Amino acid sequence: MRRILLLAASLLLTAGVQARQTDTLFAADCGIRPYTYENLSGKFRDLLAACKEAGTRVLVLEKGRYDFWPEGAVRRDWFISNTSSEEECPSKTKTVGLLLDGMEDFVIEGNGATLMFHGKMTMVAADRCRNIVLRNLHFDFERPGGSELTYLKQDEEGVEVALHRDSRYEIVDGKIRLFGEGWQSEKIHCIEYDPDTGRFFYSDGWNVLASSPAVETAPGRVRFATPPDFRPRIGNTLTVRDIIRDQVGMFLHQSENIMLEDLGVHYMHGLGIVSQYSRDITLRRVDCMPREGSGRILASSADFLHFSGCSGKVRVLGCRFIGAQDDPINVHGTNLRAVARTGEASLQLRFMHAQSYGFDAFFPGDTVSFVKAASMQRFAAATVTSVRRLSDQVVEVVFDRPVPAGLELDRDCVENMTRTPEVEIRNCFFTRTSTRGTLVTTPRKVVIADNVYCKTGMSAILIEGDAEGWYESGPVKDVLIRNNTFIDCAWNGGPARAVIALHPSNTLVDPEHPVHENVRIIGNRFQVSGNPVLYAKSTGGLVFRDNTIETLPDALPGRDLFILEGCKDPVLETE
């Protein structure tokens, strides 16, 4: 133990001396080198702390592999939007490989290094940081949280599968059990991939296999005595993972001016890269997809990018998103329901979705809107003067003026208008997801341009705004969808199975008072399988112009291209 402490002290001293001599620090000079295959969590923890203390501007890694285990990693408690309920995962502790804590003007230059994680970990967190760049890095897990099984053959006695070499399993009491480094999969979600069609879809295949007698026929091969009526498609692959979002891929928390550039993110456990109440986030050439040569199909247990309560500008440029079990991009705020008046100018507000609660949703000085849940109309505004946390689910907020008389308790909501971003998503590629491609709800300017959406199971672009389900705010006012290509999207579901869906949660639909406004869909190319190109509800000033629509072979006949409900003054022009 004494030797370990001396080594740690030496590392800190070396790092501090080097950092004071130059703005650039080389990890190798501090004894951190690739391909040792030892646990570097503690060394990186101490090195980053030393960089902060010394004011180091650039940390440089040699190219190669660096390994991180939970032991020695930083542990922090955070409530993170859209992760786990109190019942699913009472602990909010995250185990962090690289923690940037209150750092400013700092760059990690990876030179193509691969950071390999073990167990269940949050790979990177930036907590209350400014002006941070992560560049030229790859992130992966030795044993990803997702397992992959490919149907090899079937006969009258059952089915044989091949498990991917990164998937760990054991036959226990005649049944298959999936496990990893310090964990096992119990509550399973299964998505199936068909390589012939390129489609990714919900499947009951795992439930059948897990309940069937199993025998290992060779390393990595298992035979199941499945029911006679089970007829899987040979060559398809099941991707299965635990539903509990107890960690995230990365967490950017109340930080500003963060750049992720030239990254390969090859697996994320739980949720993906979550930016929460942060400002000015840019991702440029970030590839969220399986590592080249890995032979894997899955790269995230859920979303790839999740932006909750962010502001400034969110920019996603030249990225690739391949192999998510949920939405590649989701940008939204959080509506809190008004549950009690505590004074003339104060309310108790409650988080309404079990998986989104406990985080700071309002700050003094923020402008808010009061929202009618039935119509999703913003009907009054105020400024926050103070916030008091009453519990993990309830906060008391005091405003600079009386609460509007028309507010209905236990029904209407409060939306934070300050914590809403402009959004630019450009030159990106989306495929191999069973859900949507991009979800966005913000009142500020949105540009979605020059992207390719290929075979998203549900709507390629979904604009909701709700006070009923996830309580993800709110009405959009300026959206341009231009020069994108949509290939066989929404073949499996979504609102009206439409490629682009504008679907607010309002139950009161009045064309004279639309929820969404000024959505322009211009110059795009659609290749569809007979499903609608556009579904729009309660949208004013909708423009659909100069788009090309092609029908794919084997398309379903007789479907409408457009489905409109309660829209005001739409302009629909087709070629």
Language-model features: locations:
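Small/polar beta-strand repeat architecture
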Residues: F200-R245, R378-A381, V387-V423, T431
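Ser/Thr/Gly-rich low-complexity blocks that favor extended beta-strand/coil architectures
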Residues: F117, F141-R143, L152, H164-V215, ...
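Bacterial Sec-dependent N-terminal signal peptides
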Residues: M1-T22
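Extracellular beta-strand-rich solenoid/capping regions of secreted or surface-exposed proteins
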Residues: R45-A49, D67-V107, M116-R135, R143-E160, ...
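Acidic Gly/Asp/Thr-rich repetitive segments characteristic of extracellular carbohydrate-active
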Residues: A27-V60
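Short glycine/acidic-rich loop motifs that flank beta-strands on beta-rich extracellular proteins
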Residues: T56, F117-M123, R143-E148, Q247-G249, ...
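The right-handed parallel beta-helix/beta-solenoid scaffold, focusing on the short coil/turn
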Residues: D23, R57, V96, E104-F106, ...
